[in-house]
């Protein structure tokens, strides 16, 4: 239920693609293969960019398929992921400058924290991505004959 409240939420200024971008980027930092592959597939589909998931999983700071707004979002998500004890009021100004409101900032942090837990459960339980996840959103779907 909490997953759906975070990831399928219609309100706010985060797109479904941006939500998946947060999951993919922070899951890579947490070395969770399952979540990087599964959520990377959703990211490619939502953003309609076949390279974006690989770019943010390897190094979002050098990704060419994200906007400055998304980079600021990921900077904050990574700080929540790796150094949440260092977060202070100065971390919110860049997000506000890119049009995020306080609820969006809460969502960025909550998605990061929720999937930090999920990453650890997936890793210790040995979850592996389904093979079809690797191709989803990379190759155009074949059109069925009419």
Which sequence ranges carry the predicted segments?
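Hydrophobic alpha-helical segments
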Residues: 1-146
